[in-house]
UniProtKB/Swiss-Prot annotation:
GO BP: any one term: photosynthesis
Keyword Transferase: no
Compositionally skewed regions (Low complexity) per UniProt: 1-17
Protein name: Ferredoxin--NADP reductase, root isozyme, chloroplastic
Residues covered by region (Disordered): 1-27
Chain ranges passing through the membrane: none
Cofactor(s) the protein requires to work: FAD
Amino acid sequence: MATAVASQVAVSAPAGSDRGLRSSGIQGSNNISFSNKSWVGTTLAWESKATRPRHANKVLCMSVQQASESKVAVKPLDLESANEPPLNTYKPKEPYTATIVSVERIVGPKAPGETCHIVIDHGGNVPYWEGQSYGIIPPGENPKKPGAPHNVRLYSIASTRYGDSFDGRTTSLCVRRAVYYDPETGKEDPSKNGVCSNFLCNSKPGDKVKVTGPSGKIMLLPEEDPNATHIMIATGTGVAPFRGYLRRMFMEDVPKYRFGGLAWLFLGVANTDSLLYDEEFTSYLKQYPDNFRYDKALSREQKNKNAGKMYVQDKIEEYSDEIFKLLDGGAHIYFCGLKGMMPGIQDTLKKVAEQRGESWEQKLSQLKKNKQWHVEVY
């Protein structure tokens, strides 16, 4: 990605990040109140009926509470023809001006923060592959560099290369609004809120947005073997690239890629209201029970075996025998989300390896060498 890369680990910002605002005082806002789970809309808010894609009624995300019984045809298929992913088509000095299609809150009233699903129309001019990121330049002046624009913020893309409209013209982002609360007073300090996340979450259909990229190669979905196993571990908005993977595997009719392997998603969030794209993932369980597994770690609602809070590393430990066997068989494993999740996960994997009489350091080295290990944290 666009930041540091070391030992096959890319440290960058998945969807929902706002760089420079990662202090313990930052919390997601919860300033919209809903009485129940009817808080999601029924369709994506396209700018006009005249521009509404013909497949828009088949879009499946948290904004559409439905399941598609059959895969959706995509176009244009020449998006499959490139041998290498597009990289940095648009740079910060010459960004592409795209248009906001819709902004929808996708968490419930009890979620500790606000997360939005944002659809951007790039007109097919900024193509990307699953697992890549877009850079967003919010409007206004950089307070640290008078006269200069704000720095680019990276967001993992939450859609396939065809977008939620299946026509290759849109990109979806999953963005958590970053709000700063003074740790002493508990009051919000708007001057320290995340500039880019608030710009995106406050945007309206038709608003313009400056886009750079796409960037990143570490999280690209390996497609050489359509029967491979993919283990995906996410916290919060880190689920963004995995939504793209799963839509490509299970929702889209792509002649070049017929997935017949196993996709296993572990998603860690605070509570049920914080689950992202849950109905979409649940629909895959019903349609593809032999090819998809889905486990949730709800830290404020579930307990681990020691009666503590349930985190993704607890789920990994619970299924450790299966996970290690799958890794030994060549499975890919992906991590995306807050960087704070990695130490606990690494400790768990090391403990499990030792219980199996293995050296975790050697195993990790081999996984990286085999390009089975993919990490994107912020």
